[in-house]
Design a protein with these regions (language model features):
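N-terminal Lys/Arg-rich, disordered targeting/topogenic segments
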Residues: 1-15
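Intrinsically disordered, low-complexity N-terminal segments that are enriched in acidic
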Residues: 20-137
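A short, structured loop/turn motif at beta-sheet edges
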Residues: 68, 119-124, 179, 233-235, ...
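Terminal peptide-recognition signature
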Residues: 75, 188, 262
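Acidic low-complexity segments
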Residues: 104-106, 125-215
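Active-site nucleophilic cysteine motif
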Residues: 184-188, 217-232
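Hydrophobic/aromatic-rich core segments of domains that either
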Residues: 226-315
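Low-complexity, Gly/Ser/Thr/Pro-rich intrinsically disordered linker/tail segments
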Residues: 293-356
Length: 356
């Protein structure tokens, strides 16, 4: 997967297959390893949480064709950390050069940084090997009180997640007749599902550009959730962006791309997950994806317009999934990213199919 300017161009991968949900229903009926609860506000919203699935996951970054005349090369890579979706049991970094780890000041993402000086290698390969327990997501797993920084960033627009008169008008239409915060959030969620199509045939998808989403009504998961977040923030509902991968149900393989989702903040409950693009693909699961996540998400970073550490010379990073690289202060896109996984409770090998 190539990633110019820190933006992954690979397709976002399908989090789950329909067959999984058939198994899920059986598990709900017959296994004590699953728990389900419902909240009735306008409609029942099921939350399903799996007992932890343990996986090995390797994030491989390959930087190619570095110019030997460069004076300095900076490489920043997102690092997974323990959170709502996962518990990181081990995190082993394999790098041929020294590195440092810091947290970005706005979202607290863990960031690996490498600085190269002459002689500059032509190629650089860094691998991060994780062992993680995947938890699924429900609001109770998150601290219900956002920090002042979270409050600030969860309300303001970004370069691509804008709030303009068009977004405000759409939001007003979406929340009409809804009085509670969760009902207004559900109205926005339903609006996005009904006015967007999962369609990557028109160039420009994947940047999370709210204006493009409004004009075309098409895109991938990034575009769906950028529109949701812009509309939520237009209504003064705290909302944030998350990106990582969805680990398939196979025993092992290569994950073909990223997946992203959104969360909004419900006072007294916490951050509530939503996945509008998966709900569009599976309308029968729209209630499920408003308030729950598949227990196969592996999170890499939170937020948009990320300021790296040390700070990059270019613009804030729009989406931080692939490595971001600067050569003598200029963005450099000759990088390949691969994510491999293995279910530690199963054997075998399988390369997952591309996004659909």
């Amino acid at each position: 997967m190539s990633a110019p300017l820190g933006l992954p161009l690979a397709m976002d991968s399908p989090p789950m297959r329909r067959g999984f949900f058939r198994l899920l229903c059986i598990a709900l009926l017959g296994s004590s390893g699953w728990a389900v609860w419902a909240s009735r506000i306008d409609a029942s919203v099921p939350r399903v949480v799996a007992s932890g699935r343990e996986v090995a996951c390797t994030y491989l970054a390959q930087v190619n064709d570095l110019p030997h005349t460069a004076r300095v090369v900076h490489v920043w890579i997102p690092l997974a950390k323990t959170g709502t979706e996962q518990r990181i049991l081990t995190r082993d970094i394999h790098s041929p050069v020294p590195y440092a780890i810091a947290q970005d000041p706005d979202y607290g993402n863990d960031i690996l940084h490498v600085a190269l000086e002459p002689p500059i290698p032509v190629h650089l390969e860094i691998a991060i090997a994780y062992r993680a327990r995947l938890l699924g997501a429900e609001p109770s797993r998150v601290d219900p009180q956002p920090t002042p920084e979270e409050l600030q960033h969860a309300l303001r627009p970004s370069r691509f997640m804008i709030i303009d008169d068009d977004v405000r008008a759409r939001t007003k239409l979406a929340i009409a007749g809804h009085t509670t915060l969760i009902a207004r959030a559900r109205g926005i969620y339903d609006y996005v599902i009904h006015h967007m199509a999962y369609d990557k045939r028109v160039p420009g998808w994947g940047r999370g550009d709210t204006r493009r989403a409004c004009l075309l009504g098409k895109g991938n998961c990034t575009d769906f959730h950028s529109l949701f977040i812009s509309m939520a923030r237009a209504e003064r509902i705290l909302a944030r962006f998350k990106i990582g991968v969805a680990i398939p149900t196979e025993a092992s393989g290569v994950i073909p791309g990223y997946h992203c989702w959104a969360e909004f903040y419900l006072p007294g409950t916490g951050w509530v997950p939503v996945d509008a693009s998966e709900a569009w693909k599976h309308p029968e699961l729209a209630d499920y994806y408003f308030g729950a996540h598949d227990p196969d998400r592996f999170l890499l970073s939170v937020g948009r317009d990320i300021q790296l550490v040390p700070r990059q010379q270019g613009e804030p990073v729009n989406i931080f999934f692939a490595p971001y690289i600067e050569v003598d202060g200029q963005a450099f896109n000759q990088v390949q990213t691969e994510v491999r996984f293995k279910d530690l409770n199963r054997g075998g090998s399988h390369e997952s199919s591309g996004a659909g």
